[in-house]
């Protein structure tokens, strides 16, 4: 089975830290890559849903712009550790996508996201040969580990992709204080989309503010629009060239411009197949859309606690 989106059209974009702003050609290049990567994430996570498997779409979709900008600095040989550490394990789809785009695994492997026996788990599990260079749990379990990586690599900026959900965890508070005390060259890039698996933090935890919390721990904090590509580039570049721990807080709706899940908690989970079908049709990825409707869910006559004979997930 061939992957139905033209991922072979993906061309990495090389970026230099001495360049203060994107050129028009670099902007166009990045925008094309962002669109392709986001469309791919919509497709292969929805494909897992069509098979009756679980998965997560919105978080991975969200952080494509910032991750591809960081990747551009890595590719040009800048002093940035070449690992996309992510403390939000449910965004693992982007780890698999980048592993495929970087040649660590066949692109067709993405067709088996969340399938048993294929190694594309719901959270990152380290497998260097497949391009997954760290393991992480649900939320708030990785920052302390990355502090250790930053301690061992003082001459490189170490990037950790974070989330507003992760920043509610006590482990992150401890890790933040340690990073500040040790003046670690760690750059935290947070997707502040006001959505977690529990709902909207602004509703269930009023008064909590990611930027204020991190500033209180002593980090340099810069907040901005995660969908403003030019500003995002400039802010990431500044963070990478600023000594010590820096946090970028990127505001956006969950799954921007994805009808049916934009700004909603359901965007945290795997996108419903009908929403993905409409999205892919609108983007003129007709073969991908048709593949979603052609999938037949496997028959599992066994029943287990939390499932039934016609549902393979609870």
Positions of the model-derived regions?
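Non-catalytic terminal/interface segments that mediate subunit docking, oligomerization
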Residues: 35-38, 296-314
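Glycine-centered small-residue hotspots that permit tight backbone geometry or close packing
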Residues: 9, 89, 255-258
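Cofactor-binding active-site loop characterized by glycine-rich and histidine/acidic residues
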Residues: 26-30, 34, 38-51, 57-182, ...
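RNase H-like, metal-dependent ribonuclease domains
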Residues: 15-22, 53-57, 307-313
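Glycine-rich ThDP/TPP pyrophosphate-binding loop and its adjacent helix/strand module
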Residues: 77, 125-292
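Non-catalytic, mobile gating and regulatory segments of ester bond hydrolases
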Residues: 2-35
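Exposed alpha-helical structural elements
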Residues: 36, 40, 94, 108-112, ...
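Alpha-helix boundary/N-cap detector
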Residues: 25-28, 32, 283-286, 303, ...
């Amino acid at each position: 089975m061939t992957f139905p989106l033209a991922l072979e059209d993906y061309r990495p974009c090389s970026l230099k830290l001495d360049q203060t702003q994107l050129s028009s050609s670099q902007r166009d290049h990045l925008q094309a890559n962002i669109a392709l990567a986001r469309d791919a994430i919509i497709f292969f996570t929805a494909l897992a849903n069509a098979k009756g498997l679980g998965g997560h779409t919105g978080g991975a979709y969200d952080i494509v712009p910032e991750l591809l900008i960081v990747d551009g600095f890595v590719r040009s040989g800048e002093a940035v550790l070449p690992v996309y550490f992510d403390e939000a394990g449910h965004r693992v789809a982007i780890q698999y996508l980048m592993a495929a785009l970087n040649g660590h695994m066949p692109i067709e492997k993405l067709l088996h996201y969340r399938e048993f026996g294929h190694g594309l788990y719901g959270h990152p599990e380290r497998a260097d040969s497949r391009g997954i260079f760290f393991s992480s749990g649900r939320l708030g379990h990785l920052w302390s580990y990355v502090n250790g990586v930053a301690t061992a690599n003082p001459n490189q900026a170490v990037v950790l992709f974070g989330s507003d959900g992760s920043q509610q965890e006590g482990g992150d508070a401890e890790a933040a204080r340690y990073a500040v005390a040790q003046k670690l060259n760690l750059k935290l890039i947070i997707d502040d989309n006001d959505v977690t698996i529990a709902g909207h933090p602004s509703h269930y935890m009023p008064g909590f503010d990611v930027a204020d919390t991190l500033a209180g721990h002593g980090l340099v904090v810069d907040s901005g629009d995660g969908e403003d590509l030019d500003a995002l580039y400039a802010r990431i570049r500044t963070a990478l060239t600023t000594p010590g721990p820096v946090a970028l807080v990127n505001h956006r709706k969950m799954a921007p411009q994805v009808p049916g899940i934009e700004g909603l908690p359901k965007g945290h989970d795997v996108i419903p197949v009908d929403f993905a079908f409409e999205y892919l049709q609108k983007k003129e990825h007709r073969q991908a859309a048709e593949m979603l409707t052609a999938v037949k869910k496997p028959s599992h006559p066994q029943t287990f606690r939390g499932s039934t004979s016609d549902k393979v997930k609870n």
